[in-house]
Amino acid sequence: MAQVTLGGTPVNTVGELPAKGTQIDFTLTKNDLSEISSDAYRGKKVILNIFPSVDTGVCATSIRTFNAKASSLENTAVLCISKDLPFAQARFCGAEGIENVETLSDFRHPEFSETTGTRFIDGGFEGLHARSIILLDEDGKVVYTELVPEVGEEPNYDAVITEL
């Protein structure tokens, strides 16, 4: 288990972020309620922007920031993943003009948060994701991870972009 803080209070996750070289396979739900698997992204680098909810300020900022950066990334998909219902994700993207990243939900696939080690097991956000970044190579293997130490802080966007 890993530990971060939520408003300065220590909280724990179900596990650790995957080690470099680990193959990540997943199925998630798109905004139209269809399913998509990691196989759909093979051949591309994939940034997994994992966060608690689109309805929090920092999470919304991370989506906007990655959306702006994604327009200049070659052969790279940016997936913004939370437990939000796809309807909430679609509403946010529509209102914000988000077009360069995909928002995906694991509300039907709780195994995603187990595989990535990101589910909070205690605290006020219990059941939601810890703010983290996982970069996958074209074969779906982990090449970079970041577990943000304080949930209310943004991830290091430049660090993951540099790893591309």
Please give the residue ranges for each predicted region:
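Chalcogenol-based redox active-site neighborhoods
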Residues: M1-L164
